[in-house]
Structure formats: structure tokens, C-alpha cells
Amino acid sequence: MQVQPKYFEKSQYIETLNGNKVSKSSILCGIMNIRLHGKTIIKPGVIVRGDLASVNIGRLSIISENTVIRPSSKKFKGSLVYFPQNIGDHVLVGEGCVISAASIGSNVYIGNNCIISKRCILKDCCIIADNTILPPDTVVPPFTYYSGTPGVYKEDLPDCIEQFQKEYTTSLYESFLPNTPASKGLPSTPTKLQTTTT
């Protein structure tokens, strides 16, 4: 699947050795507890609360603008306990979401402005429609489509959704490119060699 290139200012992103692209205007709290497994995109305004518990985000996953990734919590003997949060491979999270799920499987699509409440479990290959609010402790089965406020089951999804999501997130990653003179419609000029004298 091919998507239109989307260009970003290279100076505004950090690119790691394993291909993660992290916006400098995102906030990664407790960075030692945050693991990005490669070719993951963290866009501007994203907040990842690794200071509360460990957060693992799989390969070729995309966290869109102004989304909050926050580990689940539960009161235990009068105090709030936070649990590690796992997000699988090929997951696309839309803009303006709050994600407090205990776990999200692979090949999952979450639309814009969704709230995935505490301790929710999203299995592989599911879709959460825009503006959906999943109540706490919701379990979304694989190959299902949920929407609404509160979010409820709407229909089953075909088996091909797995391959579609893999191809879609891969294309989004590959088309997320740093700005160049050519991408801005400017003529490219050869770089002049600079020499120094000692």
C-alpha cells in the first residue's frame, strides 16, 4: 500500500539507530522505562508516562499528535499501583487520544480522540473508531470493530485486516521523510567542499 509522503523538519526529530523517529516536542517521562522496539514514530505533543511504570511500544507503531500514553492503575490496600503497559507491533494511535490500556495487541487501529480507559485489553487486529470511549476493564476481542460512547462491539472484521494494517503502518513509516530542498520545491545545489588551513 502506498501513501503520500509526509515531510518533517529533521531538526525537530531525534532518529535512533534502530529507526525510531521521536519528536523533540514530545514528552517522554521516565525515559529509562520506555522501550521503543524500532521504526516507531512519536509525533509532536505526545506524552509517554514511563515514570509511572514501564511502557513498551512495538515495531512500526505510530503515536499521533497530542496523545497521552499512560500505564494502567488500580487501588490496592489504599494506594494506587501502576502496571507495565505493552503496545504491540503495527499499531496506529490517532491524534488526541488518552491510552491507559493494560495491553494493546499487534495490528491495531485506534482512531482520533479516543479514550482507552484503565485496564482495557485490546487483542490483535481490532479497530477502535474515532471518538470512542472504552470503559475501564473492557476487553476487545481480535478481529472486531468497536465504536461509540461508551464503546461497544459493532461488527467482526475480515482476516485481511492483519495484512492491511501491517502494510499501512509500514507505508506510513516509509513515507515519513525529512524535508529536503526537493521536497520543498526548491532547486538542489551541490554542497561546496570546505577546506581549512592549519
From Swiss-Prot:
Subcellular location, record wording: Cytoplasm, Cytoskeleton
Ranges in a coiled coil: none
Pfam families for this protein: DCTN5 (PF21711)
Stretch list, region Disordered: 179-198
Alphabetical UniProt keywords: Cytoplasm, Cytoskeleton
Keyword Cytoplasm: yes
Record's compositionally biased regions (Polar residues): 179-188
Record has rRNA processing as a keyword: no
Major site of localization recorded for this protein: cytoplasm
Composition skew (Low complexity), residue ranges: 189-198
CDD domains membership: LbH_Dynactin_5 (cd03359)
Gene Ontology CC entries for this record: dynactin complex; macropinosome; phagocytic cup; plasma membrane
InterPro entries: DCTN5, Trimer_LpxA-like_sf
Disulfide bridge map: none
Family designation: Belongs to the dynactin subunits 5/6 family. Dynactin subunit 5 subfamily.
Subunit structure: Member of the pointed-end complex of the dynactin shoulder complex.
Protein name, as recorded: Dynactin subunit 5
Gene designation: dynE
